[in-house]
């Protein structure tokens, strides 16, 4: 419920407590809206949800047509046809796709027809070319064709309006256009369609110690890896990412970048400066000029996450630790961006897998450990193995992980052979497993 979700924010912004992930997700989703509707070429809509119904302007197909190359016939002429008593018909014309035979087929007549061509008036079946004997000529007008079997009414004929009638909805608002669906839209008369615009997501890296990837860091410096990862993740979620650069630990510099991003974007994300340290200027800015709805989540990695509103725009402050920023984006930013783009709300698919080793958990928070799930080639069983280290600063474990091992709240000892839940970060939302 939207009002309940917004109310949760009122509760948590007044209390310095670790909030459950589900509450955090509900708060974020309740404070983002779908973007404006724009019109784009239909072929560019592949992978995107439509903003409105697509309605056929004509019947699809507008005429009955042949499903294969052959001869259009009156089935009544061939009711007695057999190998012992074949029926011979006069070929009175030839028809190909785009070249219409204007006449009508009468008793004892047939027309050579190609796949996709309109079935001539009077014909109610098509006999495929391979089983017809041409007695003389080249098989076109002036030839005779011999048939050795009956033809059923409708045989090898695609009916008019078989796909849709004029006025039918061929694709509903919210339905994601498949590549082949672009062809369906074209058949319904759509050269362009309406979708929700890609939300502009402003990304800012915070920290005096950060340098651009192109620079060699000096002692005490590190390359800014989070901005590249977050830009890629935002793009994958359906956003238009905009990088505003690296802000040093300076209150004025941070404020200038955050204000600019807030003016120009639909959603602002920062990484770094989200802990309770001395240099957490951005959370103080949001608290002073907007509102902070929560600033800690019962989750690892990603405990120190701030969400609020600044200038009426959603703001998400992620940890500077790469793994924490990644999990925070997956759990909070990605669902929000997809909602803004018009996708149905949802999360990555979750499936069960068998642990290949033991896992001990002593903290109460929910864990999302980087892992790899594979199917045993002999038994078909899904097996999940954690990365050797869960150090949140190591990027290689995120590159090679295809899932997050989800361990719910509370201490526990998991043993090899236990069945656990894994979040498939390699699969899109809505995937049926």
Language-model-detected regions and their locations in the chain:
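Short, glycine/charged-enriched hinge/interface segments at domain edges or termini
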Residues: 16-21, 72-248, 383, 388-389, ...
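Flexible glycine/proline-rich
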Residues: 38-44, 52, 98, 119, ...
């Amino acid at each position: 419920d939207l009002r309940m979700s917004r109310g949760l924010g009122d509760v948590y912004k007044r209390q310095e407590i670790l909030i459950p992930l589900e509450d955090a997700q509900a708060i974020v989703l309740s404070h983002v809206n779908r973007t404006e509707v724009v019109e784009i070429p239909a072929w560019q809509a592949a992978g995107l949800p439509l903003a409105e119904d697509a309605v056929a302007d004509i019947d699809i197909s507008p005429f009955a047509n042949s499903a294969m190359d052959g001869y259009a016939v009156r089935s009544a002429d061939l009711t007695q046809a057999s190998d012992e008593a074949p029926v011979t018909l006069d070929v009175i014309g030839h028809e190909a796709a785009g070249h219409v035979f204007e006449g009508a087929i009468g008793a004892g007549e047939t027309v050579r027809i190609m796949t996709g061509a309109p079935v001539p008036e009077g014909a109610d079946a098509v006999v495929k070319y391979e089983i017809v004997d041409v007695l003389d000529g080249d098989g076109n007008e002036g030839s005779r064709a011999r048939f050795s079997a009956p033809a059923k009414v409708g045989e090898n004929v695609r009916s008019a309006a078989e796909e849709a009638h004029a006025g039918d909805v061929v694709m509903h608002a919210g339905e994601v256009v498949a590549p082949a669906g672009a062809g369906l839209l074209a058949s319904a008369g759509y050269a362009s369609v309406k979708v929700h615009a890609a939300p502009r997501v402003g990304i800012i890296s915070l920290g005096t110690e950060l340098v651009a990837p192109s620079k060699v860091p000096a002692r005490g410096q590190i390359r800014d890896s989070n901005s590249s990862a977050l830009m890629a993740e935002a793009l994958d979620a359906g956003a238009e990412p905009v990088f505003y650069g690296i802000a040093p630990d300076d209150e004025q510099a941070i404020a200038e970048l955050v204000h600019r991003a807030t003016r120009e974007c639909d959603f602002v994300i920062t990484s770094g400066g989200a802990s309770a340290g001395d240099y957490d200027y951005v959370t103080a800015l949001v608290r002073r000029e907007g509102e902070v709805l929560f600033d800690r989540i019962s989750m690892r990695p990603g405990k120190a996450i701030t969400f609020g509103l600044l200038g009426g725009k959603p703001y998400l402050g992620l940890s500077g630790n790469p793994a924490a920023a990644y999990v925070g984006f997956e759990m909070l930013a990605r669902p929000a961006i997809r909602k803004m783009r018009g996708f149905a709300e949802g999360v990555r698919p979750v499936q069960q897998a068998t642990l290949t080793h033991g896992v001990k958990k002593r903290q109460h928070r929910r864990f999302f450990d980087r892992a790899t799930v594979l199917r045993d080639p002999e038994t078909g069983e899904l097996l999940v193995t954690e990365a050797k280290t869960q150090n949140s600063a190591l990027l290689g474990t995120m590159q090679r992980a295809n899932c997050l091992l989800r361990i719910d709240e509370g201490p526990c000892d998991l043993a090899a052979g236990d069945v656990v839940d894994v979040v498939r970060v390699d699969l899109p939302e809505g995937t049926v497993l």
